[in-house]
């Protein structure tokens, strides 16, 4: 009797809530900019952009200028930018100039929002800057297939003691979106991060390189699991991943432009010092990465920030080309 009742309830749910209806209900919870909505409806190339780099990655007004320049690069290469953030509890897919300015000026007072934090920020009508994991969630909700960021989170050094592993990795393992980044941040344990990505069944390929990049430097000393040589190569992989209905994501690792990679040794030295200081000051959790990046920037006299901006712009360029190539296959 109980089994029959349960089956009846499941049948009723299926009748009243089809996958399409469920998706429409989810989309009604977010605000999609007119430009992004039109592009998605017409099958045009759209590139998702995270917002933590704006609020926590660099100071105002440099963060606003960089965000505008990155969006311009996306547009110039034939795609529509969709910067994602939560404003007054409303998830926004694509920001107006006024919203972008507000987010940038609020800076670190905006909550750094990973996937686990989304419900709380929405429920409390807060302001949230999305990390990779949260951006993946919202991009997937509205059907964006390509996401550009600076670098993803990963397995932290000494994770065998702290168990500090970014939710970016598990989010990638369950979200079929292509992430374009300069690899993982050099403050992390890159070999262990690659191992964890393999465990999560994430396809990882370096762009025009056989070696996995280390954010501020072209090479990490780790062989890339795979290699792609063009935006079209990347688009074909994404297309096949979608058609096969695989639920894991893709990571395309783009080496930093050569003329900004030269300062890699200086930045690595500063990174080691910053890591030591973080341990001494007991800086942990989601406060660690912003602390380390800010301290490395201080120790390098701004060199690391300039390199960070350069690699994000380069990722936006290549990511846009990938999104356009993908739109031509669909």
From Swiss-Prot:
Native source species: Arabidopsis thaliana (Mouse-ear cress)
Broad class of enzyme this protein falls into: lyase
UniProtKB keywords: Glycosidase, Hydrolase, Lyase, Manganese, Metal-binding, Peroxisome
Compartments, as annotated in UniProt: Peroxisome
List of residues binding Mn(2+): 164
Protein name (record): Pseudouridine-5'-phosphate glycosidase
Function: Catalyzes the reversible cleavage of pseudouridine 5'-phosphate (PsiMP) to ribose 5-phosphate and uracil. Functions biologically in the cleavage direction, as part of a pseudouridine degradation pathway. Acts together with the pseudouridine kinase PUKI in the peroxisome to prevent toxic pseudouridine monophosphate accumulation. Can catalyze the formation of pseudouridine 5'-phosphate (reverse reaction) in vitro, with a catalytic efficiency 4 times lower than the hydrolysis reaction.
Family indicated by similarity: Belongs to the pseudouridine-5'-phosphate glycosidase family.
Keyword Ribosomal protein carried by entry: no
Active site (record annotation): 50, 185
Cofactors named for this entry: Mn(2+)
Gene (UniProt): PUMY
Cofactor mode of binding and number, as noted: Binds 1 Mn(2+) ion per subunit.
Predominant place of localization: other
Catalytically driven reaction(s): D-ribose 5-phosphate + uracil = psi-UMP + H2O
The protein's Enzyme Commission number: 4.2.1.70
GO molecular function, one term: RNA glycosylase activity
Positions with a binding annotation for substrate: 112, 132, 166-168
Pfam families, A to Z: Indigoidine_A
Assembly behavior: Homotrimer.
């Amino acid at each position: 009797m109980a089994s029959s009742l349960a089956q009846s309830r499941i049948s009723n749910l299926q009748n009243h809530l089809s996958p399409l209806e469920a998706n429409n209900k989810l989309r009604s919870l977010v605000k999609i900019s007119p430009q992004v909505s039109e592009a998605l409806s017409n099958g045009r190339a759209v590139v998702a952009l995270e917002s933590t780099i704006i609020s926590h990655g660099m100071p105002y007004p440099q963060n606003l200028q960089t965000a505008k320049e990155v969006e311009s690069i996306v547009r110039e290469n034939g795609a529509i930018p969709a910067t994602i953030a939560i404003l007054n509890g409303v998830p926004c897919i694509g920001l107006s100039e006024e919203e972008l300015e507000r987010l940038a000026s609020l800076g670190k007072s905006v909550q750094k929002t990973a996937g686990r934090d989304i419900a709380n920020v929405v429920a409390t009508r807060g302001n949230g800057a999305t990390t990779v994991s949260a951006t993946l969630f919202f991009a997937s909700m509205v059907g964006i297939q390509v996401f550009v960021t600076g670098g993803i989170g990963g397995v932290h050094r000494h994770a065998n003691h702290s168990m500090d592993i970014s939710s970016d990795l598990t989010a990638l393992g369950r979200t079929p979106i292509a992430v374009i980044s300069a690899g993982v941040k050099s403050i992390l344990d890159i070999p262990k991060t690659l191992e964890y990505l393999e465990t999560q069944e994430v396809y990882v390929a370096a762009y025009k390189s056989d070696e996995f990049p280390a954010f501020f430097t072209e090479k990490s000393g780790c062989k890339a699991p795979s290699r792609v040589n063009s935006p079209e190569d990347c688009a074909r992989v994404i297309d096949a991943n979608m058609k096969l209905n695989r639920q894991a994501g893709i990571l395309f690792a783009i080496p930093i432009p050569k003329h900004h990679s030269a300062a890699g040794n200086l930045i690595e030295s500063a990174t080691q010092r910053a890591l030591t200081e973080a341990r001494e000051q007991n800086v942990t959790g989601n406060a660690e990465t912003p602390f380390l990046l800010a301290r490395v920037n201080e120790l390098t006299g701004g060199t690391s920030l300039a390199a960070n901006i350069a690699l994000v712009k380069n990722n936006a360029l290549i990511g846009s080309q990938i999104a356009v190539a993908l739109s031509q296959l669909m």
